[in-house]
Regions:
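N-terminal accessory/targeting segments that precede structured cores
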Residues: 1-137, 163-191, 195, 199-202
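Conserved kinase catalytic-core helix
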Residues: 63, 69, 214, 218-225
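Core mixed alpha/beta domains of very large multi-subunit molecular machines
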Residues: 115, 214-215, 229-232
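Conserved ATP phosphate-binding architecture of protein kinases
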Residues: 136-145
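Glycine-rich ATP phosphate-binding loop
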Residues: 140, 150-157
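Conserved HxN/HPN-centered segment at the entrance to the catalytic loop
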Residues: 187, 220-233
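Hydrophobic alpha-helical positions that pack around
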Residues: 211
Length: 233
Protein backbone atom coordinates (compact mmCIF):
# COMPACT_ATOMS: atom_id res chain seq x y z
CA UNK A 1 0.00 0.00 0.00
CA UNK A 2 2.83 2.43 0.89
CA UNK A 3 4.45 1.69 -2.47
CA UNK A 4 1.21 2.65 -4.25
CA UNK A 5 0.90 5.86 -2.26
CA UNK A 6 4.50 6.83 -3.07
CA UNK A 7 3.96 6.07 -6.76
CA UNK A 8 0.73 8.07 -6.64
CA UNK A 9 2.61 11.13 -5.37
CA UNK A 10 5.19 10.70 -8.13
CA UNK A 11 2.46 10.53 -10.77
CA UNK A 12 0.56 13.46 -9.26
CA UNK A 13 3.70 15.59 -9.43
CA UNK A 14 4.27 14.55 -13.05
CA UNK A 15 0.69 15.41 -13.98
CA UNK A 16 0.87 18.78 -12.31
CA UNK A 17 4.34 19.91 -13.36
CA UNK A 18 3.71 18.83 -16.97
CA UNK A 19 0.75 21.18 -17.25
CA UNK A 20 -1.75 18.35 -17.76
CA UNK A 21 -3.87 19.31 -14.76
CA UNK A 22 -4.11 22.97 -15.82
CA UNK A 23 -5.16 21.81 -19.27
CA UNK A 24 -7.85 19.45 -17.97
CA UNK A 25 -9.10 22.24 -15.72
CA UNK A 26 -9.86 24.37 -18.77
CA UNK A 27 -12.31 21.75 -20.04
CA UNK A 28 -13.60 20.08 -16.87
CA UNK A 29 -13.60 22.20 -13.73
CA UNK A 30 -11.66 20.09 -11.24
CA UNK A 31 -12.94 20.21 -7.63
CA UNK A 32 -11.14 22.79 -5.46
CA UNK A 33 -9.71 20.16 -3.08
CA UNK A 34 -8.02 18.27 -5.94
CA UNK A 35 -6.74 21.49 -7.49
CA UNK A 36 -5.24 22.49 -4.16
CA UNK A 37 -3.51 19.11 -3.81
CA UNK A 38 -1.92 19.37 -7.26
CA UNK A 39 -0.93 23.01 -6.70
CA UNK A 40 0.85 22.16 -3.45
CA UNK A 41 2.66 19.15 -4.87
CA UNK A 42 4.05 21.10 -7.83
CA UNK A 43 5.20 24.32 -6.11
CA UNK A 44 8.16 25.84 -7.92
CA UNK A 45 8.30 23.37 -10.79
CA UNK A 46 5.38 23.97 -13.14
CA UNK A 47 5.93 23.74 -16.87
CA UNK A 48 4.87 27.00 -18.54
CA UNK A 49 5.98 26.10 -22.07
CA UNK A 50 2.60 24.69 -23.11
CA UNK A 51 0.46 27.78 -22.58
CA UNK A 52 0.47 29.00 -26.20
CA UNK A 53 -1.44 26.01 -27.59
CA UNK A 54 -5.07 25.00 -27.31
CA UNK A 55 -6.02 22.66 -24.41
CA UNK A 56 -6.01 19.50 -26.54
CA UNK A 57 -2.53 20.21 -27.92
CA UNK A 58 -1.31 21.03 -24.43
CA UNK A 59 -2.60 17.73 -23.10
CA UNK A 60 -1.05 15.80 -26.01
CA UNK A 61 2.36 17.32 -25.32
CA UNK A 62 2.08 16.76 -21.58
CA UNK A 63 1.06 13.11 -21.89
CA UNK A 64 3.67 12.46 -24.59
CA UNK A 65 6.39 13.54 -22.19
CA UNK A 66 5.17 11.35 -19.34
CA UNK A 67 5.84 7.97 -20.93
CA UNK A 68 4.03 4.75 -21.82
CA UNK A 69 1.17 4.70 -19.32
CA UNK A 70 0.08 8.25 -20.10
CA UNK A 71 0.47 7.92 -23.86
CA UNK A 72 -1.87 4.93 -23.66
CA UNK A 73 -4.20 6.86 -21.36
CA UNK A 74 -4.39 9.69 -23.89
CA UNK A 75 -5.04 7.30 -26.77
CA UNK A 76 -7.81 5.65 -24.79
CA UNK A 77 -9.39 8.99 -23.85
CA UNK A 78 -9.40 9.91 -27.55
CA UNK A 79 -12.05 7.20 -27.96
CA UNK A 80 -14.16 8.60 -25.10
CA UNK A 81 -15.54 12.02 -26.10
CA UNK A 82 -18.33 11.36 -23.59
CA UNK A 83 -15.73 11.90 -20.85
CA UNK A 84 -13.44 14.63 -22.20
CA UNK A 85 -15.54 16.26 -24.92
CA UNK A 86 -15.47 16.06 -28.72
CA UNK A 87 -12.85 18.75 -29.32
CA UNK A 88 -10.26 17.42 -26.89
CA UNK A 89 -10.87 13.82 -28.03
CA UNK A 90 -10.13 14.90 -31.60
CA UNK A 91 -6.89 16.57 -30.49
CA UNK A 92 -5.83 13.46 -28.56
CA UNK A 93 -6.17 11.38 -31.74
CA UNK A 94 -2.93 13.09 -32.83
CA UNK A 95 -1.03 11.70 -29.83
CA UNK A 96 1.96 9.86 -31.26
CA UNK A 97 2.97 6.51 -29.81
CA UNK A 98 6.65 7.27 -30.31
CA UNK A 99 9.38 7.31 -27.69
CA UNK A 100 13.17 6.97 -27.95
CA UNK A 101 14.41 3.44 -28.63
CA UNK A 102 16.18 1.53 -25.89
CA UNK A 103 19.75 0.39 -26.48
CA UNK A 104 20.64 -2.64 -28.59
CA UNK A 105 22.47 -4.33 -25.71
CA UNK A 106 19.26 -4.17 -23.65
CA UNK A 107 17.32 -5.72 -26.52
CA UNK A 108 19.80 -8.59 -26.69
CA UNK A 109 19.47 -9.17 -22.93
CA UNK A 110 15.68 -9.32 -23.21
CA UNK A 111 15.80 -11.79 -26.12
CA UNK A 112 18.32 -14.04 -24.38
CA UNK A 113 16.22 -14.07 -21.20
CA UNK A 114 13.03 -14.93 -23.11
CA UNK A 115 14.30 -17.67 -25.44
CA UNK A 116 17.25 -19.07 -23.47
CA UNK A 117 20.96 -19.38 -24.21
CA UNK A 118 20.66 -22.36 -26.58
CA UNK A 119 18.07 -20.77 -28.88
CA UNK A 120 19.91 -17.46 -28.69
CA UNK A 121 22.92 -19.10 -30.36
CA UNK A 122 20.81 -19.39 -33.53
CA UNK A 123 20.77 -15.61 -33.88
CA UNK A 124 23.62 -14.54 -36.13
CA UNK A 125 23.08 -10.80 -35.99
CA UNK A 126 20.64 -8.27 -34.54
CA UNK A 127 20.45 -4.80 -36.06
CA UNK A 128 19.69 -1.45 -34.48
CA UNK A 129 15.99 -0.71 -33.87
CA UNK A 130 14.04 0.33 -36.97
CA UNK A 131 10.88 1.40 -35.11
CA UNK A 132 10.16 2.22 -31.47
CA UNK A 133 6.88 2.81 -29.64
CA UNK A 134 5.87 3.10 -26.01
CA UNK A 135 5.45 -0.64 -25.43
CA UNK A 136 7.83 -2.36 -27.85
CA UNK A 137 10.35 -1.85 -30.62
CA UNK A 138 11.36 -3.75 -33.76
CA UNK A 139 14.76 -4.97 -34.96
CA UNK A 140 15.82 -6.69 -38.16
CA UNK A 141 17.89 -9.80 -37.46
CA UNK A 142 19.61 -12.69 -39.20
CA UNK A 143 19.09 -16.21 -37.81
CA UNK A 144 20.14 -19.79 -38.55
CA UNK A 145 17.18 -21.87 -39.69
CA UNK A 146 17.71 -25.47 -40.83
CA UNK A 147 21.33 -24.76 -41.81
CA UNK A 148 20.31 -21.67 -43.76
CA UNK A 149 20.47 -17.98 -42.97
CA UNK A 150 17.14 -16.19 -42.76
CA UNK A 151 16.22 -12.52 -42.46
CA UNK A 152 13.57 -11.83 -39.80
CA UNK A 153 12.08 -8.98 -37.80
CA UNK A 154 11.93 -9.26 -34.00
CA UNK A 155 9.48 -7.28 -31.87
CA UNK A 156 10.67 -6.81 -28.29
CA UNK A 157 8.80 -5.46 -25.29
CA UNK A 158 10.54 -2.64 -23.46
CA UNK A 159 12.52 -3.88 -20.42
CA UNK A 160 10.29 -4.06 -17.31
CA UNK A 161 7.43 -2.34 -19.17
CA UNK A 162 4.76 -4.64 -17.71
CA UNK A 163 5.92 -3.99 -14.14
CA UNK A 164 6.16 -0.22 -14.69
CA UNK A 165 2.76 -0.04 -16.38
CA UNK A 166 0.98 -2.06 -13.69
CA UNK A 167 2.64 -0.09 -10.86
CA UNK A 168 1.53 3.22 -12.38
CA UNK A 169 -1.97 1.91 -13.05
CA UNK A 170 -2.26 0.59 -9.49
CA UNK A 171 -1.48 4.10 -8.27
CA UNK A 172 -3.91 5.68 -10.73
CA UNK A 173 -6.62 3.25 -9.64
CA UNK A 174 -6.04 4.21 -6.00
CA UNK A 175 -6.35 7.89 -6.94
CA UNK A 176 -9.50 7.25 -9.00
CA UNK A 177 -11.11 5.27 -6.19
CA UNK A 178 -10.33 7.93 -3.56
CA UNK A 179 -11.64 10.75 -5.76
CA UNK A 180 -14.84 8.96 -6.79
CA UNK A 181 -15.67 8.01 -3.21
CA UNK A 182 -14.93 11.35 -1.58
CA UNK A 183 -16.01 13.93 -4.18
CA UNK A 184 -19.52 13.42 -5.54
CA UNK A 185 -19.02 15.76 -8.53
CA UNK A 186 -16.07 13.67 -9.71
CA UNK A 187 -18.21 10.58 -10.31
CA UNK A 188 -19.26 11.91 -13.71
CA UNK A 189 -15.62 11.58 -14.86
CA UNK A 190 -15.82 7.77 -14.43
CA UNK A 191 -12.17 7.62 -13.38
CA UNK A 192 -12.26 4.05 -12.02
CA UNK A 193 -13.88 2.81 -15.23
CA UNK A 194 -11.26 4.59 -17.35
CA UNK A 195 -8.32 3.08 -15.45
CA UNK A 196 -9.88 -0.40 -15.41
CA UNK A 197 -10.50 -0.42 -19.18
CA UNK A 198 -7.05 1.01 -19.88
CA UNK A 199 -5.47 -1.85 -17.92
CA UNK A 200 -7.47 -4.47 -19.84
CA UNK A 201 -6.68 -3.00 -23.26
CA UNK A 202 -2.97 -2.47 -22.67
CA UNK A 203 -2.37 -5.85 -21.02
CA UNK A 204 -3.78 -7.44 -24.18
CA UNK A 205 -1.52 -5.22 -26.30
CA UNK A 206 1.53 -6.27 -24.28
CA UNK A 207 0.80 -9.96 -24.89
CA UNK A 208 2.44 -10.25 -28.30
CA UNK A 209 0.91 -13.71 -28.80
CA UNK A 210 -2.40 -12.05 -29.72
CA UNK A 211 -0.68 -9.96 -32.39
CA UNK A 212 1.17 -13.02 -33.69
CA UNK A 213 -2.06 -15.04 -33.89
CA UNK A 214 -3.81 -12.24 -35.80
CA UNK A 215 -0.87 -11.95 -38.23
CA UNK A 216 -0.84 -15.71 -38.85
CA UNK A 217 -4.58 -15.68 -39.50
CA UNK A 218 -4.13 -12.84 -42.00
CA UNK A 219 -1.33 -14.83 -43.68
CA UNK A 220 -3.57 -17.89 -44.07
CA UNK A 221 -6.43 -15.80 -45.45
CA UNK A 222 -4.28 -14.02 -48.05
CA UNK A 223 -1.54 -16.52 -48.99
CA UNK A 224 -3.12 -17.20 -52.40
CA UNK A 225 -3.71 -13.53 -53.22
CA UNK A 226 -1.36 -12.19 -55.89
CA UNK A 227 0.59 -9.07 -55.01
CA UNK A 228 -0.23 -9.37 -51.31
CA UNK A 229 2.44 -10.67 -48.97
CA UNK A 230 2.10 -11.13 -45.20
CA UNK A 231 5.22 -12.32 -43.33
CA UNK A 232 4.88 -15.56 -41.38
CA UNK A 233 5.31 -15.34 -37.62
Amino acid sequence: MLKRVFKLFQIARKLSTSGAIDTINQVHQIPISINLFFSLISIGSKNTSLRNNNPGQNLCEALQGMGTTFIKLGQFLATRPDIIGEEMAKDLEKLQDKVPAFELYEAKKVIKKEIGEIQYQNIIEIGEPIAAASIAQVHFAKIKNENQEKQVAIKILRPDIEQLFNEELDALMLFAYIVENTISKAKRLKLVEVVHLLREITNIEMDLRFEAAAANELYENTKLDKGFNVPKI
